[in-house]
Amino acid sequence: MPEKHKRKHLTSFQMIILGFAGVILLGALLLMLPVSSAERVVTPFDQALFTSTSAVCVTGLVVQDTGSYWSGFGQAVILLLIQTGGLGVVTVAVSVFMLSGRKISLMQRSTMQDAISAPKVGGIVRLTKFILRGTFLIEGIGAVLLLPVFCRDFGIKGIWMSIFHSISAFCNAGFDILGTADNTFVSLSGYAGNFWLNIVIMLLIIIGGIGFLTWDDVYTNKLRFKRYRMQSKIILLTTAILIFVPAIFFFVCDFGQVSIGKRTLLSLFQSVTTRTAGFNTADLSSMTEVGQAIMILLMLMGGSPSSTAGGMKTTTVAVLLLNAFATFRSREDAGAFGRRFDSQVIKNAATIAMLYFVLFFFGGITISVYEGLSLQLCLYEAASAVGTVGLTLGITPGLHILSRLILIVLMYLGRVGGLTLIYAVVSRRNTNAKMPLEKITVG
């Protein structure tokens, strides 16, 4: 009898990348509707697709000013896409299943585990509920804290402003609705000296960017740092370093024309927002080349695993640096806090870093050649896209369709993650066979 072919099922990684793609397409179709634009016109598909991708991938790059071009309905669609992208498509889907009272299957639990990089399947439903409660609680508190600022400036409309910017900040999206027909793409530049708003936005960005698993660790163990998992310790320490060290460079190299207090605030805000969020309170095009180069590096590094942020992740950077330090000291194993890294983790980190740098350079160089723009400008936009940051030196709205498509691909790949993409495309096969060993000289 002929052997029957086994029915092939989508892997959890394939479901993740297809889920993101499906939400992006649905968002683009909704944004094309006349009701989505302030002028009640049909938005071209390429512009709607770019905006939807940027929202779902929590990036913040735009070709139309969010505050002046889109209607209230359009802004609500964008905010819903940001929330979906920030939580993750799989998290939202599992949440819908739970709210409907349906039982979560083992396959769905496994997909959720891969989506948020959870260490085990057990307890995944509890963790999902914790993520949802924590997300809405923090976003709600953020909105309340922003009310005094926006209601003072916009009256009753300030309520919507507070909700939108709280969610956008927590999800590390960088979208703002402060632009007007006469003053577009302003971001938070009008609040550069507002201490309260800057602090609230920075805290929302940091909390959203450290990851759901780190929240769970902190919530469970409170301030007992020694009890945290090694990953949580690395994330918190690396995040602190990547906030304060770049802030010192920004303070020294840029913003010299303002007072010490405002200069400190600008430097801190720029350091926090550059890795993940994409808000800006300063004129980025006027920053020094050193400042812009530091920003490119920060954008590529991104946030932390299982967070609302993109990029190659803080843990990837930490693992590579610690492995290099171990090599310099002629140590067999790399690790931190009395624990060593598995060799596969180091391989994964190197693969992710290589993938992001290839995408970054390929995207930037291609746009530069096609548009005839300087390489530094285009590398900046490419880093912003693949790191899902959203900062721009002002060239994105004027790019041709091909260059926009490149940025769309970079944003998408930057959000779904390097390993997710690799595992979705390449089948993983276990084999005990090994090739003969031969040494090769490197360096």
What are the residue ranges of the model-derived segments?
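Membrane-proximal intracellular helices of multi-pass ion channels
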Residues: M1-G443
